[in-house]
From Swiss-Prot:
Residue ranges the record marks as coiled coil: none
PTM (free text): Phosphorylated on serines and threonines by host kinases, including human casein kinase II.
Cofactor detail note: Binds 2 manganese ions per subunit.
An MF annotation (GO) of this entry: endonuclease activity
Chief subcellular location: host cell
This protein's encoding gene: PA
Protein name (Swiss-Prot/TrEMBL): Polymerase acidic protein
Amino acid sequence: MSKTFAEIAEAFLEPEAVRIAKEAVEEYGDHERKIIQIGIHFQVCCMFCDEYLSTNGSDRFVLIEGRKRGTAVSLQNELCKSYDLEPLPFLCDIFDREEKQFVEIGITRKADDSYFQSKFGKLGNSCKIFVFSYDGRLDKNCEGPMEEQKLRIFSFLATAADFLRKENMFNEIFLPDNEETIIEMKKGKTFLKLRDESVPLPFQTYEQMKDYCEKFKGNPRELASKVSQMQSNIKLPIKHYEQNKFRQIRLPKGPMAPYTHKFLMEEAWMFTKISDPERSRAGEILIDFFKKGNLSAIRPKDKPLQGKYPIHYKNLWNQIKAAIADRTMVINENDHSEFLGGIGRASKKIPEVSLTQDVITTEGLKQSENKLPEPRSFPKWFNAEWMWAIKDSDLTGWVPMAEYPPADNELEDYAEHLNKTMEGVLQGTNCAREMGKCILTVGALMTECRLFPGKIKVVPIYARSKERKSMQEGLPVPSEMDCLFGICVKSKSHLNKDDGMYTIITFEFSIREPNLEKHQKYTVFEAGHTTVRMKKGESVIGREVPLYLYCRTTALSKIKNDWLSKARRCFITTMDTVETICLRESAKAEENLVEKTLNEKQMWIGKKNGELIAQPLREALRVQLVQQFYFCIYNDSQLEGFCNEQKKILMALEGDKKNKSSFGFNPEGLLEKIEECLINNPMCLFMAQRLNELVIEASKRGAKFFKID
């Protein structure tokens, strides 16, 4: 046990809190620094409970935190049984006898409500949540706590923070959010024995194989003889690409591929309001928009501009407004919601026949043949939307990111400066706007799926951002904005398997008329007018434009939920790629070359008017981010197959650049495999077209392995 952490804890915490913290660290094998965190949390829970009585004179609160896990689980189950409550799948800190509800206490040093949002995403409204911060902020999902409780807790947290800062331990006791506790592992005899047994023949031990691999040096003649020996055993002849050149990929012909992403992007229109930290839940945001923005006045016209089932969509929109007005966010089952939600419409594969009926023929048991999707041509709208995603939006700060941990050396200072620079470029893009929309909206859908699988729920399609003006003026706290893009209805969602699907019906706002080729899957209504702010010289004027309501029925799966709710990974991957390049240049020169590398190092990003376009890394970041995000939203079996096969052509291109010989068994078969993946995925068709352009450019520069049709 570290004396440093224990002594500091004993200096300002109650002895009982220190004892509980030490036992918890020993029980769960946590790092010693957790003594202080656990002790503070336990003492706050005690302050929340102490000296408060119910109307009958008994203790109002039951403290669950601080007990052994087995005892705590038994106590919680006993309370659920005594008060006729559903058992919870997680342990809470406190039980309120008067309210008959469990309470979860959280403590954070973050200045925003991200910790509260993460807790609320896991727990929902199944219990009360109170998150106290060291700077006096309180986030909660219900009324309370009492004023006396708040004052006692905030006073204690301020005292604890001051004491820890004097000891230079305030940052030390907190690990960064993305860093796990380090657990030292030792290799036991059983592990070493299993490791030696798993090595391939002819090796006997792991150390023998490791020694061979470290000393191995390739012999070209020996490798060539092995290749010729393998060739004699394989029926397919090896073909060198100098004589058997790659042709261009044949793109499918037919109607243009439609828009398939779950939410509108370029055409989406948003209503904005100043964010209220006290009302940050999805349902509260939606109620505030309808109350303050008078969105209940949006009424779709009887006749749609395009699409099917207009009566069902209109009636469901009226039910949505009623659910928001009565604040339940629940839509009762009826013909319209069941039809659009697909409830009771699952087709039976084989008809059920009772024993009393006649035996049916073999023909009657045959299932109908699966219809393959219709091949679609490359969509012209895709390039325009790609360029739109690269450009800046009116707001910034769309993607919630973790705080930067304190830097320990000079290289980490470079990395922190670089990441802040890149984040400043990327956070204001339209692509970041769509990422933020996916993270919050799909995160809210996941919570509703988990907590209310049998109900039809209303969820906002929304995001959070910050004003550019506030950021540029250097104000201490930029104005946070809530942005509403539309409303989503979640149908029943009993997701028992990872590939389980559930239906969503989206109603999205737009000020653009629909493109019949792009928006084939949408039913579009005129729904009134809205005011758009436009710049005219130095002044800003308002112009009234038509408002359209884009309606669509689609589906999400558990896997797709996970992909879209964690879209910020695209952000991290993009920044990591550029960070590696910049830090490598700085390490080579042994000086800070971050800004120089960002501004001077070029990257090819595409083609315009027959010429390749290169941009500095600082701007090429945008293209990298859009590509990563589009992989996330358009990912399917077509895209996976295409990316897997196109790598072989890119490897041949790299070999050509290095003047090396390349060969394979069936170059024409490789191209046919790629073409099998080109059906109707817009991203696949876009990448195939880019690959053809790359082949043309390589051939112009003297590539030997490619031919132009």
